[in-house]
Curated annotation (Swiss-Prot):
The organism of origin for this protein: Ralstonia pickettii (strain 12J)
GO BP of this protein: tRNA wobble position uridine thiolation
Active site residues per record: 100, 196
Function: Catalyzes the 2-thiolation of uridine at the wobble position (U34) of tRNA, leading to the formation of s(2)U34.
Enzyme Commission number, as recorded: 2.8.1.13
Domain of life from the UniProt record: Bacteria
This protein's name: tRNA-specific 2-thiouridylase MnmA
Disulfide-linked positions: 100-196
InterPro entries xrefs: MnmA-like, MnmA-like_C, MnmA-like_central, MnmA-like_central_sf, Rossmann-like_a/b/a_fold
A Pfam match: tRNA_Me_trans_C
Residues that, per the record, bind ATP: 9-16, 35, 124
Gene of this entry: mnmA
Coiled coil ranges: none
A Gene Ontology molecular function term of the record: tRNA binding
Length: 370
């Protein structure tokens, strides 16, 4: 009987490298597949694709697996980056990693892997898959500090049924130990933190290459103009640094935070103080929903939710989950809930899915003075 073939997404990082080694040790027929999904500035100092490929080849040679590269740059631009720009243009703050996982890593990549004769695929994500009575659940990783289920919440049954997450049961420290013990050339390589496949770079400069500046007033809730913004697309709710209005103006010493965007008036509203009422919301609305099990949780269900990555699950109640819309009411006010980000629901360790935040209702309704 031939060995089960697993195609591993190898990025050149430690996690995917250890993933490939673990599966090789378990006796699988492992094939590494390196994705190139960005090529607008291959010669830029911020583009690490060339070095990443070198690392992949070096690791593959060391652990004894075949590896090849595939170019999904066109798919990435069409399915992920175009949406990224549309969202920013509309004043929202998207999370491209969520869409990249659903459309590229677990769709385009999965399809390509199946064409290579794969039985299943594997990646270095920190999450777990559990089969229960023929259905597949997405679970948080054992190492909650590295859990990536938030970014994977749009995966469906077909995708999860063909996916392995070998690192889901171990802490990141153990992964680093394994990398050092087996002599991986990238054992000390730092984790990537930039935009999915685009890398680490000055974000405002990068965005300005694709979206024009459109200056407008920066106002306080009482209507006072205190500065000028360069374009609403370049700011996100809860932002404290880089607003360009200096320090305290009321003697309190409290920092300024971006609180609202009025797209029609091209006005950016800022408030002072981390806990200003404009930054707090008890009700969150989301659309563009995706559920791991294929159906939404029942209305009235008490669950946990994240409205941003690395946030602790916040107790909430599903007030509505019908007609393509989701409304969550939280027990405690949530801070700087940002349209464009994902609201992801959890039942304990199980990630149920979620949607894209469309709006948040402030804990205290205060109308801005124009």
């Amino acid at each position: 009987m031939s060995k089960k073939r697993i195609v591993v997404g190898m990025s050149g990082g430690v996690d995917s490298s250890v993933t490939a080694w673990l599966l090789k040790q378990q006796g699988y027929d492992v094939v590494g597949l390196f994705m190139k999904n960005w090529e607008d500035d291959d010669d830029s100092e911020y583009c690490s694709t060339r070095q990443d490929w070198i690392d992949v080849v070096s690791v593959a040679d060391l652990i004894g697996v075949d590896v090849e590269a595939v170019n999904f740059a066109a798919e990435y631009k069409d399915r992920v980056f175009a949406d990224f720009l549309r969202e920013y243009s509309a004043g929202r703050t998207p999370n491209p990693d969520v869409l990249c996982n659903a459309e590229i890593k677990f769709k385009a990549f999965l399809d390509h892997a199946m064409a290579l004769g794969a039985d299943t695929i594997a990646t270095g994500h920190y999450a777990r898959v559990r089969e229960v009575d023929g259905r597949f659940e997405l679970l948080k990783a054992f190492d909650h500090t590295k859990d990536q289920s938030y970014f994977l919440h749009r995966l469906n049954q077909a995708q999860l049924s063909r996916t392995l997450f070998p690192l889901g049961e171990m802490p990141k420290t153990k992964v680093r130990e394994i990398a050092a013990e087996i002599g991986l050339p990238n054992a000390k390589k730092k984790d990537s933190t930039g935009i999915c496949f685009i890398g680490e770079r000055p974000f405002r400069d990068f965005l300005n290459r694709y979206l024009p500046t459109k200056p407008g007033p920066i106002k306080t809730p009482d209507g006072k103009t205190i500065g000028e913004h360069i374009g609403l697309a370049f700011y996100t709710l809860g932002q404290r640094k880089g607003i360009g209005i200096g320090g305290s103006r009321d003697g309190t010493g409290d920092a300024w935070y971006v609180a609202r965007k009025d797209m029609a008036a091209n006005t950016l509203y800022v408030v002072q103080g981390h806990d200003h009422p404009w930054l707090l919301a008890h009700t969150v609305h989301a659309d563009d929903l995706s559920w791991v099990a294929g159906h939404a949780p029942a209305e009235g269900t008490h669950l946990g939710a994240k409205t941003r990555y690395r946030q602790a699950d916040a107790p909430c109640t599903v007030a509505r989950a019908a007609g393509g819309a989701l409304t969550l009411t939280f027990s405690e006010a949530q801070w700087a809930v940002t349209p464009g980000q994902s609201a992801v629901l959890y039942d304990g360790e199980v990630c149920l899915g979620g949607g894209i935040i469309s709006a948040a209702e402030p804990a205290v309704v205060e109308k801005a003075i124009a």
